[in-house]
């Protein structure tokens, strides 16, 4: 009875957590352990999976009108919302099964989960006792996952009228779903931006760390850099890194009449000037692209490169430390995927090094950008 009462009370509080548009972040200092081994990564991963599952389960109690109000929308695409929930449950089950493989080394947050019904059962019962070693983490984590779930459900509720990375239009679009457990790909948007010019610093940091990433560039930015410098200087800056395109300029490619020309011009420019770095990937600005574009992209030999983990480090959003802690929490939750940093903002110069340092002993890996999406 106590568990039922606690869960019911928590359901009532679900609707009064965060205003629509709030960006989720979590102070990782509330978690009492450093991720200094693969086992400790798994402990933290199990905790975040169970907390998110608890929040996800609670959201299913809201009817369509209540959910729309919760998300700050007049109408929602409930089919897209339910499809996202279903994909999330399957991913959570898979991830928990990976995370519980180390339960013989540390049994924290280890429960009997054999299938989706038992995961939902454990999510409904999940709570952290007041005398727990992890109590300081519990409520901040719950708030984080409630806000993060709102972000994702809102994108699904607007899909496909407003396209985003929340779902794919076909197999020609790729994200990190097919990546192996504990494997992540670093990607960077606006990666030829001139002011501020963080690209060279980021690329050099990656080289010194023996890591690479995929830098997505605008055609007009590459053209401007070539006007101010040489091809050789660009080749040196992007050495050992991969280059995809975001189109000629940063604008929605879903309703722009010249979107095809934007993609073709930028891809041809990068491929001709930086062939060793070029990878045939188009990242739609803000994830916005057309639903009927498969024929075009296949004719160009391009794939659409989406992402799974958004640092929310764009203009006016999270600062570097907040962004990094958000990313780490989502890495623990999803256990693999594509991370999407914004090189146009200075936050990346603090968030990325912190993230790489925090995970150095955790047993994760960074995907080779030349192998990703192949």
Question: Language-model segments: what does each one mean?
Answer:
Residues 2-11, 15-186, 197-200, 204-213, ...:
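Terminal accessory/targeting
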Residues 116, 120-124, 128, 132-137, ...:
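Metal-dependent polysaccharide deacetylase catalytic core of the NodB/CE4 family, i.e.
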Residues 160-177, 253-271, 324-327:
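Short, composition-biased local secondary-structure segments
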Residues 176-178, 235-237, 330-331:
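Short glycine/proline-enriched loop/turn "hinge" motifs that connect secondary-structure elements
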Residues 189-190:
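Alpha-helical, coiled-coil/dimerization segments enriched in small aliphatic residues
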Residues 305-307, 312, 316, 329, ...:
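Alpha-helical scaffolds that organize eukaryotic protein assemblies
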Residues 320-332:
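A short, acidic, amphipathic alpha-helical segment used as a generic capping/interface helix at domain edges
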